Regions:
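Structured beta-strand/loop patches that form or line metal/cofactor-binding pockets in enzymes
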Residues: 43-86
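Active-site- and interface-proximal helix/loop "cap" or "latch" segments in soluble metabolic
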Residues: 73, 84-143
Length: 166
């Protein structure tokens, strides 16, 4: 699936089928956000105990019921592996999976920089496209920046990562 932004600020998705035929469709950005969040929230490959974890940090959001524990394994300044345990809403689970995809394999310094960019984005601080690119799919979480009830869900695991990477 290719995603391209057109002049009307809608996204144009180009679906390729197995027979190489292409079908184009215009969709609103909210539809793409919803589908991306659902896809990330359903992923399970990062949800497991992490043997040899060098850090563990629990995050709890009583307003939504999210209770997620982030586990990290660092070695020689590299984030070697990250996983999580617990349960949360679709937003917190998707956000956690995005975070793990983002920081796994990076140096601690690179991961800290991504966290800084993320928190600036969520606070509505202006940032360059280049800065935001380091967030990958996590950029869509900016959608929740102005939703007081959901921003806690979107940032929960990122706060845990911030503690673990200090």
């Amino acid at each position: 699936i290719l995603i391209c932004r057109d002049v009307s600020k809608n996204l144009r998705l180009i679906f390729s089928s197995s027979c190489s035929a292409r079908k184009e469709t215009d969709v609103g950005i909210e539809t793409v956000y919803q589908q991306t969040l659902l896809d990330y929230s359903r992923r399970t490959e990062h949800k497991h105990q992490l043997d040899g974890a060098t850090g563990v940090e629990r995050g709890h959001n009583p307003s939504c019921g999210d209770d997620l524990t982030l586990l990290i394994k660092q070695k020689d300044g590299i984030v070697e592996d990250v996983s999580f345990l617990g349960a949360g809403c679709a937003v917190s689970t998707a956000s956690t999976n995005m975070l793990i995809d983002l920081i796994k394999g990076k140096t601690v310094k690179e991961a800290q920089r991504c966290l800084e960019v993320f928190f600036n984005m969520m606070a509505g601080k202006p940032q360059s496209e280049e800065e935001l690119e380091c967030l990958g799919d996590a950029q869509i979480l900016s959608y929740f920046a102005e939703m007081p009830a959901r921003i806690k869900c979107a940032t929960l695991s990122w706060h845990s990562a911030q503690v673990l990477l200090k």
